[in-house]
């Protein structure tokens, strides 16, 4: 079948008629379907049920350094959680802040802080006039919705088999109003692309005109391999350090597709200056 963009108008009308009939037939069945995305099936949830037995009235609520987790916790997370999530992201433990169960909430909070307070002592984005944000497409609509919510102008960057088109990215960041880019570097939806080594190195070497430009590196699927041999992603934080450019990356991950999505852990990792 030819792509819709290559078909004549009459053929498109005929196809629309067929699809409309199919849609009407589906509606007549009055199905109640759960169309939510990224939702583990009951069989996967059953794999982690034993986690519910790890904490009881006698054991399991004291951390290795004696913090009672039944009470208020630590601002940046308990040591065990920081160690686990640091290992997942391939970063030092002291760069990690553990949040709630939603990495998307942490991304929202980071962008909100950038607009309201600025980045690393810089001028708040809200006071800088027009703000642009790079959005690799196809990509994650909820990322884009965050920056759109705060009034940023979304600028599309086409994806390639290597990741975002870096020639385009490098050209756009010459504009000081471009403040960041959204990235899902491993198994990026919907194409499942993992960024190439060259793409990661070019991100690490970026010298944007805006000092407060940040790569929002959502490494959501960093350990989510479907097969015994998974893809390998070059470590952006380490590559950026080689370029003395580690401030440029803000990394996120979570356990939402590993254990129970509603009660997992999310984390942000960034340089000490950030």
Provide a role label for each language-model segment.
Residues 2-80, 86-87:
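N-terminal "arm"/small-domain region of PLP-dependent enzymes with the aminotransferase-like
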Residues 222-224, 232-274:
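Active-site PLP attachment segment
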Residues 30-32, 178, 249:
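Core-facing hydrophobic residues within beta-strands of well-ordered domains
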Residues 218-219:
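Walker B catalytic acidic pair
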Residues 37, 159, 254:
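Active-site donor-binding loop signature of nucleotide-sugar glycosyltransferases
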Residues 67-211, 222-244:
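Conserved core of the PLP fold type I
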């Amino acid at each position: 079948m030819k792509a819709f963009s290559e078909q004549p108008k009459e053929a498109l009308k005929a196809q629309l008629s067929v699809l409309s009939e199919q849609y009407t037939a589906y509606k007549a069945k009055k199905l109640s379907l759960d169309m939510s995305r990224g939702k583990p099936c009951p069989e996967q949830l059953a794999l982690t049920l034993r986690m519910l037995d790890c904490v009881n009235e006698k054991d399991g609520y004291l951390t290795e350094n004696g913090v009672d987790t039944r009470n208020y916790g630590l601002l940046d997370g308990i040591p065990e959680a920081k160690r686990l999530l640091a290992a997942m992201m391939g970063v030092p433990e002291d760069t990690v802040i553990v949040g709630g169960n939603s990495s998307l909430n942490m991304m929202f909070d980071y962008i909100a802080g950038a607009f309201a307070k600025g980045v690393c002592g810089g001028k708040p984005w809200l006071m800088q006039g027009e703000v642009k944000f790079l959005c690799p497409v196809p990509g994650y609509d909820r990322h884009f919705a965050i920056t759109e919510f705060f009034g940023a102008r979304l600028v599309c960057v086409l994806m390639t088999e290597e990741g975002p088109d870096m020639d385009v990215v490098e050209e756009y960041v010459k504009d000081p109003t471009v403040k960041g880019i959204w990235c899902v570097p491993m198994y990026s939806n919907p194409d499942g692309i993992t960024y190439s080594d060259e793409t990661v190195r070019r991100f690490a070497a970026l010298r944007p005109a805006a000092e407060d430009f940040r790569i929002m590196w959502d490494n959501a699927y960093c350990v989510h391999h479907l097969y015994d041999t998974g893809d390998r992603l070059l470590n952006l934080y380490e590559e950026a350090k080689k370029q003395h450019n580690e401030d440029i990356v803000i990394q996120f991950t979570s356990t939402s597709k590993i254990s129970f999505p509603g009660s997992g852990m999310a984390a942000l990792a960034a340089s000490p200056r950030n």
